[in-house]
Amino acid sequence: MRDIYFLFPQMNIESGGHLAQMKLLELAQRIAPAQAVVYGSREEGLPFLEDVLQQTDADKSIFIIHWGFHVPDLIDRLADRNVVYLSYSTGYGFQIPVRVPIIAGSRHTLAYWSRHAPDSLIYYLPAIISEEFMNLHRPRDIDIVVQKRKSSRYLLEELVPALQSQYSVMVIDSWVEDLAAIFNRARVFLYDTSEYWAQYGLSEGFGLPPLEAMACGCTVFSSINDALSDYLDPGFNCHKLHTYSLQYDLKQISSAIHGWQEPSLEHDPAADYRSEAVQRRLEVILTGLDDFFDHQRLDPSAFQPVNKTFVSKPASGIRRWIPGFFKNWIKSLRAG
């Protein structure tokens, strides 16, 4: 199996995406030779991309890229290398060449790239939920937890103030080392990122906090945008937030707090996202990537880029087709 290099702009990043990538790197190291490489600027104790390119055989390594805004430049920079794009958020607007396989971090992203890169090799690999996110079955002294970062104005400026007059509400406004401990103290977790992602024209890449909260026993109220729809099922394992009116949300949240019950001991809502399950998928994917790059080296007859009109503007054709279809259908009814 080829050596694998996970590319990072830098290593000192406090974000969920960076943490998810680090967890995946650790998992890959159980399967194949894998290490982190930085490409922004040199950092002590870490390989730098330009040095790695000079020291490695082009065919005996795989470079995994993921930082959305840097992807087009990195693909050009690694033109003669085996490159894989690990895609979380979508909507950046770039095309991925058919020579670059795509690993989608959610089923929402999988569907996006299956439409916009129909000739590419595509896999699905969910982000990892750490074992620390589990229900400890302890008394809960916080009614509601909210993470300020990426939250909608409605959540922070209307809903939270209305709830604070009746319930104990913790608003997390900085990086937390032990988020699982907080989730294990809370009955309800509120999450609404639809406004945040919409303003940038991007999608929620994986949205792990609601699933982490569920794994710790919280009742979740959330937006269901993008990758959140992978695992959130309103009315069955969560409640949709920002529904109809402020008063409706308040009523639903109040009912959840007063009716909160300890979840089943046997059920783990994050079972498919645990390290063991993700590792099994990763083993299959890495084997498939190795085979793909072996074949690519021997077979230069790749599909030509798909017509952009076909990929990105299918609705225009439908609009032209529908009126004619119904006109002919009505004529046939009259004739009958």
Question: Model-derived features: where do they sit?
Answer:
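Structural alpha-helical scaffold elements that stabilize or flank donor/cofactor-binding regions
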Residues: 55-57, 95-96, 181-182
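Short alpha-helical segment that forms part of, or immediately flanks, the ligand-binding pocket
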Residues: 180, 208-215, 229-230
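A short, well-ordered alpha-helix in the C-terminal region of glycosyltransferases
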Residues: 259-276
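Nucleotide-sugar-dependent
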Residues: 193-207, 225, 229-230
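Catalytic core of nucleotide-activated saccharide and alditol-phosphate transferases
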Residues: 67-160, 300-301
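N-terminal pre-catalytic "stem/leader" segment of glycosyltransferase-like enzymes
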Residues: 1-67, 218-228, 234-251, 262, ...
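Conserved active-site histidine-acidic residue motif and adjacent donor-binding/catalytic loop
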Residues: 170-185, 196
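Acidic donor-binding loop of glycosyltransferase active sites
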Residues: 184-200, 218
